Amino acid sequence: MKTFSEMSLRPVILVALFFLAILSSVPRVEAADAMDWPHWRGPEWNGISRETGIVDKWNPKGENVLWQSKEAAGRSTPIVMNGKIYTIVRDQPGTPKEGEKVLCLDAVTGEKKWEYAFNVFLSDVPDTRVGWSCITGDPETGNVFALGVCGQFQCLSPEGKLLWEHSLSEEYGLLSTYGGRTNVPLVHRQVVIISAIVIGWGKMAKPAHRFIAFDKRNGQAVWFEGTRPLPYDTTYSTPVLTTINGQRLMVFGSGDGGIHAFQPLTGRKIWTYNVSRRGVNTTPLVVGNTIYSGHSEENIDSNKMGALFAIDGTKSGDITKTGEKWRVTEWFVGKSSPIHIDGRIYAAEDKGTLLVVNAADGKLVKSLKLRGPVRASPLYVDGKIFVCTSNGIWWTLAPDKAAGVKVLNRTRFTSTEVYGTPIVSHGRLYVPTTGALFCVGGKDIKPKAGKRPETAKETPREEDAEIAHVQVVPVECLLKPTVDGGQAQEFQVRLYNAKGQYLRMAKPDEVEFTVNGPGKIAKGEIPGGAAPRKGWEYSTPKENVHTAVSVTAKFGKIQGEARIRLIPDYNWKFDFSNGKVPITWVGCRYRHISLDFDLLKKVEKESALASQLYIYLMTSFTNSNNPAVTIGKAPQVYNDGSPRRTWSAMLRFLGLLGQVKNVDEAKAKLDPAFAILAREKFVARHAWSAPGGGVQLAVTRGPRKVDGNGVMVKIKTIPKGARSQGWMGFIEGSNYTIQSDIQGATKDNKLPDIGLSAQRYTLTMLGASQQLQIRTWPTQLRMAKTVPFKWDPNKWYTMKLEARVQRSAGGATKAVLKGKVWVRGEKEPEKWQVEAVDESPNIKGSPGLFGNAIDAEIYYDNLTVTKDK
């Protein structure tokens, strides 16, 4: 069994004075030991070390290799802190117990100190991309932070003890995909910040690249903010810290194609520079007040691909036009992050050309072909640039005024690849590869480092004591209401100035709290801790409800907000008769809708096109950004006048793309279907127009709600959300059964895949292969069991998955999973059709859904979750 902790992050009561001490302290950002390397880009976040005496030459076959560790091989860039080297890698690869682990070695000898292993679950990432992220160390506490490919975010002590953890997928909606792109944590003072594409709940149901700041000491969520919704990509650009105009900033590349600057303690956005139509993966480089970065996608203002650019970081707001210092297109700097040396930028293109560029104006000085693609970033130390191609060609270069760079040495790895970046610490060079982690150095190492250059200072907070930002902590939580009263949650109100600097805690009499939803919040003495103290405490309602609550703290004219999900203990039942997908479900709204199944089938008998139009319009109305559209007070407009080309998207879904070229043809094809939907009072009116010669359609929703058999539909109208996971509740759940009526539609003789999840395992009806499968990791199938199972489209079935944790007398633990499917209305079969045992078990996890509706819709009804007796 993996070394999971069974601890859960229940509502935490914290002493206000304790937090005040934490928040008032301002520890140094750099490593306590000047030669430690606590972040993959180094203590200065720029790929530069001030050490000297680093070897020029080495060879993987032995020359200057002090030690190597095959167990530490992988994609990740390691870190070094307090004499230990940390990395994240595959665990027991190719076995039924394969997972992921944090590995700690002695930095001098390579001796293994400890490991912390955990499972990969409910993720499409392949095993070869496990260990994508990098460990981040906290010099103040010595703790390390790790993000696994499936969203397991953990804080570990220097001895490898789990201090706290979050399942970012189940709790917040982190997206884990086949691409494997996983972000890297950033520590700043009392918070640790992590990001991902998040498909959450409530106002965060639509995908966006979002950042969550957790208190590094206890894991409480402090702030939760994001960039523009509906990004095209997951990305792995790491945020870096800098100070500009006396203000501390976190600068990063985003999945929305922009470079952004946020305040790290508040999450408040300071500026945005939009540059790419797809996500930015390079980690920004900050030199003074200038930010350098690149991408290898299409530019937003032309059809040219790729760019290297410089931004003026002193600006604010949307600086797309006002903040650009220079940009050179058709340089494909999309994977490797640049470095800056003596007024020049050294940046590696994806295909392997090293560019040497004047930092001031972007003019090319020289270039060097590196003979292979590059994913790792260059390292500069002791007058040398180290860079390696992904096919294993290692270069040792020296900056040269005339030639750009001078080649000092070149060597090559065999039968290995390089994705991680070399680092240096205490006179030793560490080189990560997929074959081994190498430690490189001379025989008599005498570590020595020069002084780091002075960095810009923050404006003393005493110069601005005016309150400009109110922060309610925790910003998100999940509570269990019961008829007996349920749980309570203490809230803190933290106050910041305009530069995002912490000022103080608010006093109870200074803040007016309001609650939007059931439950109540009261101020007064809160028990617990060393002694009772004054504060605010929210109490759940005395009823078993699935609902969302927001609490708002108003300080003068400024306010802050926190969100609460109320989810009772099992047993649950959902029939979707209210026409809504439960707001508390993570990753479900937006990708699922509720509709009237009786109306759908009635319309389908008259016109298949009208039934498909009903699905499309219901999705569009439900997911509209304009609430007036959802309730029929304003029309939803479809045209091709924006990059999303909503008119073409509708035609594609209806199978009419290329068949309708003007308004007259559109009327001929669609007006009969609209007439049917108008008769049923689902559509109030629709209108055609032709602005600029193109087709435009405006549709206003009618008064009809879901008044027949309400069902939930996994829709295929969202191409990037057609295959997805969803989660329904708390992650501590174990030993329960999930059951639902399900139906799969068909299109072009293709069927969807339909699944229910329990305890991080999924029972899936596979459409194309006509199989029934229990699994935990779809792309690895380490413990999966599969049986033939023929099923038909447009037919209701009942699906049932049972998850159990079994512990033997000797202490061994395993998970036992059982699944069955039968035609709805028929007698439930006594025998389970598929059973699986996992000797490396998931011992807890949220109930949930899996669906692959790329080919056709999926319908759910009468869903239940029951606790085992």
Predicted regions and their residues:
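Noncatalytic, solvent-exposed loop/strand surfaces
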Residues: A31-E476, G485-Q492, A498, I567
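Extracellular carbohydrate-recognition regions
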Residues: D36-H39, I567-G641, M650, A668, ...
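Short flexible loop/turn segments that cap and initiate beta-strands
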Residues: G486-Q489, Y496-P527
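Extracellular/luminal low-complexity segments enriched in Ser/Thr/Pro
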Residues: G519-H546
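Short tryptophan-centered beta-strand motifs in secreted/extracellular beta-sheet-rich domains
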Residues: F576, S740, W796-G810, L817-G819
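Secretory/extracellular carbohydrate-interaction modules
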Residues: D598-K602, E606-T619, T630, D707-G710, ...
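Short, aromatic/His-centered strand-loop micro-motif at the edge of beta-sheets
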Residues: P778-T798
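Flexible glycan-contacting loops in extracellular carbohydrate-active proteins
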Residues: E828-I858
